[in-house]
């Protein structure tokens, strides 16, 4: 019973912290979703996914098979960023059933929006710089999906959502302090 209580303490805390972020995001932008990344405790993925969803958020990706998300370190295999952009039409053509997202800073995000990626995960861009960037990227491609990532937490989720992004990628709920719960045992 103690192990179950510990799991319940932790998962309830994750759901509660997630709910706080979802409420803050939706208050600022009802169309902005909170998305938790795959950087969770090993062996607890299924439980944490359930807790996140109970809190009102969604898993960013449950696995590599869901969405193609290209990070900076992947660009090496394409010959660098510029070579990746040149190959983008062919890459998108091979990802017939998948959306192609790329994590980028502000400068590269502009290039990627022009190149026609399905989505951009804008990494570590401060809120005050993100809002004008979102407007600029939407002017380039009104259909591009924009996700803010890097440092998104319950205290700033509303501010990030207010920039007009479609989603907030975060690991913050996974660091929730377990709730203080107890169990009472009674004879049958």
Task: Set out the residue ranges of the language-model regions.
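Helix N-cap/beta->alpha junction signal
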Residues: 105-106, 153
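Glycine-rich beta-strand-to-loop/alpha-helix junction loops that act as flexible
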Residues: 122-123, 146-152, 171-172
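Structured adenosyl-cofactor binding patch, chiefly the S-adenosyl-L-methionine
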Residues: 179-187
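Acidic/glycine-rich phosphate/pyrophosphate-binding loops and surrounding catalytic core
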Residues: 1-103, 110-111, 115, 119, ...
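Short acidic, glycine/proline-enriched helix-loop-strand junctions
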Residues: 139-145, 187-188
């Amino acid at each position: 019973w103690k192990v179950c209580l510990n799991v319940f303490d932790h998962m309830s805390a994750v759901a509660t912290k997630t709910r706080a972020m979802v409420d803050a995001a939706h208050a600022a932008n009802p169309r902005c979703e909170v998305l938790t990344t795959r950087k969770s405790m090993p062996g607890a993925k299924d439980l944490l996914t359930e807790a996140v969803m109970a809190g009102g958020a969604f898993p960013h990706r449950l696995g590599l098979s869901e969405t193609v998300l290209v990070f900076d370190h992947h660009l090496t295999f394409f010959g660098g960023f510029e070579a990746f952009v040149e190959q983008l039409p062919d890459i998108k053509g091979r990802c017939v059933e998948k959306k192609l997202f790329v994590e980028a800073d502000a400068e590269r995000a502009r290039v990627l929006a022009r190149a026609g990626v399905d989505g951009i995960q804008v990494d570590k861009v401060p809120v005050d710089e993100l809002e004008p960037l979102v407007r600029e990227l939407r002017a380039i491609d009104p259909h591009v999906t924009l996700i803010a990532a890097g440092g998104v937490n319950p205290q700033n989720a509303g501010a990030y959502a207010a920039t007009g992004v479609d989603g907030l990628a975060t690991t913050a709920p996974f660091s929730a302090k377990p709730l203080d719960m107890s169990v009472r045992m009674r004879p049958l």
